[in-house]
Design a protein with these regions (language model features):
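Short, surface-exposed recognition loops and adjoining beta-strand edges that mediate ligand/DNA contacts
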Residues: 40-42, 70-91, 208-288, 392-399
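Conserved, well-structured interaction surfaces
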Residues: 53, 61, 93-165, 205-212, ...
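Long, intrinsically disordered, low-complexity segments
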Residues: 2, 26-27, 195, 284, ...
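Acidic, glycine-rich segments characteristic of secretory precursors and extracytoplasmic regions
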Residues: 2-6, 12, 23-78, 460-469
């Protein structure tokens, strides 16, 4: 771990004083979050450029979470991967089995943890945005940078909340008093997306192109553009999805497509934004890799997906570098090895949140939906070329092209941040794909239940269809 990384993680000032509660732990209920910080405490955290920077660094730490907290690192990837079909669960934990069999109960503690942790992060970013906007003592350029970072984190968090739960309460920087009482009802998905897009557009305006530091652990203008491209794709606004993806893809001085073997190292040119960790060992590696010759990995790539990687005339380099067959007894398990660092002695990987390949695939899908099949093919082929395989056929129809993009997204993004789950939901393909392999699948399973603990704390929260408290 380099010295800059140590400074990033170790020199954060006491955030519990500034933000009115720990950034590193989350409470299960809004009513347990504690009293909001006073105006004096806000000012204490934002009197100087250095102290304000430290508060924002704390938001990144909070977003990363821990190996057992479902913030925006690998635990969220696990739960969505189990709910979809890009992860096979080989364990027996009852709460995880509920995700894997799409039999979630509203009392599932992990579902409640996701909600509570993400809303704790919303609270922290709201407090930061409010304090930053009220501050008169910060250097204007730094103030803009920090507001942009906080709004990016808030938008990213809401993007997960709305795609996991559907309509969710919308708390902003102006709602700090209401937030503590947890009295707001669910807000429409459309309105939440308006806030997401507004935050990201403001962030893109305020953030600079240059990264703060060398390891891309803080967002820049292109990170905001990349997330805007994703959000617009999810909203089926293909004009803007293509526009913002193109902005990122045009930054060839910053971003490149390295070999799959190095895509996830923390100096990779593909990385647009990554969440740092203390020793360069990700919870992805800890969860996906099983140590010991006879240890069965808890989470693996299903055999049916492994068999869809191309092998002729050339073998897909993603299959060779990101999946490792492991035989235990008479059964073969396909271990996900995108992240390979399992020891601090190596310590060269962080949690990659945004990377360039996704932007090619976003633009390909946007172009295909706008009848630009030639442009879509060019973008898919850019991803396939990095994987060492031939381009797709030039004779595909729009429907065939979209199917090819779905497959390419699976091969490229499996096991990462819920991409497969969200893809199947937003394209209305969840039932067609999951019903044949999920015996208990129901169409209402596309949303997680609103946690019963949250409904007890706030009786204005309605339950999603298909669930009971």
């Amino acid at each position: 771990m380099n010295n800059e990384m140590k400074r990033f993680l170790n020199n954060i000032i006491p955030l519990s004083v500034i933000m009115g509660g720990s950034l590193l732990t989350s409470c299960a209920k809004f009513v347990e979050l504690g009293a909001p910080p006073t105006q004096i405490e806000y000012q204490d955290g934002f009197l100087t450029d250095a102290s304000a920077q430290s508060v924002i660094l704390g938001l990144y730490v909070s977003a990363t979470g821990t190996a057992t907290n479902a913030n925006l690192s690998s635990m969220t990837s696990l739960y969505t991967g189990l709910a979809a079909d890009d992860l096979q669960y080989n364990g027996a934990d009852a709460l995880l089995v509920e995700f894997y069999t799409n039999g979630l109960l509203s009392t599932n503690g992990l579902v409640n943890n996701i909600w509570g942790n993400l809303y704790q992060l919303i609270k922290n970013t709201n407090n930061a945005v409010a304090a930053l906007e009220a501050s008169n003592s910060l250097t204007p350029a730094i103030k803009d940078q920090l507001i942009g970072e906080a709004k990016f984190i808030r938008a990213y968090t809401y993007l997960y909340l709305v795609n996991l739960y559907g309509d969710v309460p919308l708390y902003t920087a102006d709602d700090s008093g209401v937030f503590e009482s947890a009295v707001l009802p669910r807000t429409s998905t459309d309105r939440v997306y308006e806030q997401i897009l507004s935050d990201l557009q403001d962030a893109e305006t305020k953030l600079g192109v240059a990264y703060q530091g060398t390891f891309r652990g803080r967002v820049n203008k292109h990170a905001a553009s990349a997330l805007l491209a994703r959000a617009y794709l999810y909203r089926k606004d293909y004009v803007n999805a293509e526009l913002y993806a193109s902005k990122v893809l045009a930054a060839t001085d910053l971003y490149s497509m390295p070999a799959p073997s190095t895509s996830f190292t923390n100096t990779s040119g593909e990385i647009i934004f990554q969440l740092a960790n203390i020793n360069g060992v990700t919870t992805f590696a800890a969860n996906y890799n099983a140590v010991g010759a006879t240890t069965i990995p808890a989470y693996t790539l299903p055999d049916r997906h492994y068999q869809t990687f191309e092998t002729t005339p050339e073998e897909d380099l993603r299959k060779l570098n990101w999946v490792t067959p492991k035989t235990v007894g008479d059964k073969v398990y396909y271990t996900i090895t995108k992240y390979k660092s399992t020891s601090p002695a190596i310590g060269n990987e962080y949690h990659v949140v945004l990377r360039l390949a996704e932007q090619y695939l976003i633009r390909a899908e946007a172009r295909a939906n706008r009848d630009n099949l030639e442009g879509a093919k060019a973008d898919i082929d850019a991803v396939r070329s990095r994987a060492g395989i031939e381009g797709i056929s030039s004779d595909l129809t729009e429907t065939q092209m979209l199917t090819a993009i779905e497959t390419e997204r699976l091969h490229e993004l499996f096991g990462e941040y819920g991409h497969r789950w969200f893809d199947l939901k937003r394209t209305d393909r969840a039932t067609a794909v999951l019903a044949p392999v999920k015996a208990n699948w129901q169409t209402t399973d596309v949303l997680f239940p609103i946690p019963s603990a949250q409904r007890l704390a706030n009786n204005r929260l309605t339950q999603n269809l298909g669930y009971e408290d």
